[in-house]
Amino acid sequence: MDNEITSTQNPRIKAACLLRQGRGRQQQQRFLVDGEREIQRALTAGWPLEEVFVCESLLDRPESRQLYDQLVETGIPLCTVTSQVMEKISFGDRSEGLLAVARLRLLPDLDQLTPAPGMLVAVVESVEKPGNLGAILRSADAAGVDAVILANQRTDPFNPNAIRASTGIVFSMPLFAAPSEQVLAWLTGNGFKVCATRIDGSSSYLETDWTGLVAIILGEEAAGLSSCWSGAGVTTVSIPMRGQADSLNVSTTAAILFYEALRQRLL
């Protein structure tokens, strides 16, 4: 283990701080993994970790020490820092004493996604808020969604907020990225039933058959889905609402539809 870093002006610390921003992640081709649960899930998924910053005074739980010992066994470079330095590089107001730097991977194209009988995929188009994307990934994992496709991608899934909102599921959920038109062509070409969520959808989600090969299309609540999802071969689906609100948060919509699909598949 390296000598303890005590200054927030240390070059390694300054480089780590830049990873909070998308530009820094792209320039360095790295990103931060903040939190014990998130680091553990990255390890379990076999994600390449370049180094881990450690503040031993914050490792005050048995689970923290256990993860620390596991990191030591893997041979990943460890760097001790003071609590002040850890606070500087940690995301938000939570610091658990461990923060990893991971290697960025490009999201694969759709030609690397192989359809299978009964596959359920989610297509997330142009969602801007990292927290929403992370929450969608978390719900998708819980409900048994097989893959998530980012269409017309506008959000970095390795943004610290997305990672935290996903509780580290971003490391294990199969993720793909492609333009919306290409996604639609791939789905229809492979026999998927394409269900696009719209306020004025032609059928209620409760009246929709979610079994078989199904793709759930989700868009940013402000702008909605692009026009390519309103043509032939696309079923539009709505969620009934009885109050004054005219839309739901996209992650809430996702959870409702994912679990209706799961319910039908368990019958």
Feature roles, as predicted:
Residues 1-93, 193:
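N-terminal positively charged helical leader segments and presequences
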Residues 22, 113-122, 232-241:
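Glycine/charged-rich beta-loop-alpha catalytic/anionic-binding loops adjacent to active sites
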Residues 35, 128-136, 248-253:
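Amphipathic alpha-helical repeat scaffolds
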Residues 44, 70-73, 79, 84, ...:
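RNA substrate-binding interface of SAM-dependent RNA methyltransferases
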Residues 93-118:
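Acidic/glycine-rich phosphate/pyrophosphate-binding loops and surrounding catalytic core
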Residues 100, 139-143, 154-157, 161-169, ...:
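Structured adenosyl-cofactor binding patch, chiefly the S-adenosyl-L-methionine
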Residues 195-245, 249:
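Active-site/ligand-binding-proximal alpha/beta "capping" segment
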